[in-house]
Design a protein with these regions (language model features):
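Active-site/ligand-binding surface loops and adjacent short beta/alpha elements
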Residues: 1-83
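Terminal connector regions
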Residues: 145-167
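Short Pro-Gly-centered flexible turn/kink motifs
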Residues: 126-144
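Short alpha-helix capping/helix-loop boundary micro-motifs
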Residues: 119-123
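Glycine-rich active-site loops that engage anionic ligands at enzyme catalytic sites
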Residues: 70-114
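Hydrophobic residues positioned within well-ordered beta-strands of beta-sheet architectures
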Residues: 65-67, 101, 136-138
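Residue-level signal for secondary-structure boundary sites
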Residues: 19, 88, 111, 144-146
């Protein structure tokens, strides 16, 4: 949306979630395996720049295989489906005010504490036999307007003033 603030958007997951984003230690350059960062209970994450002050929001366990980035008032945005991916991460530049949010379905992750250096021991890595291949798919679809494509959960939760509350 033209002239929209970052905070005018939210992430809407297809399923109810009860999970956490793994915290990132910028000094170690690793995700902290035993820690829990941002907690997601429900389907909606209202965006703020401060969510990304410690790096990406990386969800190592997520039930949804579809998420939408939605403008709260217009309902416009994008839907990303990732049926073949096990995890997802979201990031933007912080503290700068970049005009984007990166949505990255992952199989694997950045380095985690205690994981070691061998690729085969990394989380969510798939092993393929020599010469084998494995296809993964994802799709990005524009959300045109609230009435046409906005996920039902958000449509029900929008207040008349454009605000949002949990369903």
């Amino acid at each position: 949306e033209e002239d929209a603030a970052f905070e005018d958007y939210c992430l809407v997951f297809e399923k109810e979630e009860s999970t956490y984003a793994m915290p990132f230690d910028s000094l170690l350059g690793e995700y902290l395996s035993g820690g829990s960062g941002y907690e997601l209970h429900g389907r909606i994450i209202p965006l703020s720049r401060e969510l990304f002050q410690d790096n990406a929001l990386y969800f190592p366990e997520i039930a949804s295989r579809r998420v939408s980035l939605v403008h709260r008032e217009s309902g416009r945005g994008v839907e990303v489906s990732y049926p073949d991916f096990e995890t997802i991460a979201f990031w933007t530049v912080y503290p700068d005010r970049a005009p984007f949010l990166c949505i990255e379905p992952w199989n694997g992750s950045g380095a985690r504490t205690g994981e070691g250096d061998e690729l085969i021991h990394k989380n969510h890595v798939r092993r393929l036999e020599p010469g084998a291949s494995h296809d993964l798919s994802m799709a990005v679809r524009p959300l045109i307007s609230r009435t046409e494509t906005l996920p039902e959960v958000l449509r029900r939760s929008l207040l008349p003033d454009g605000g949002i509350h949990p369903v």
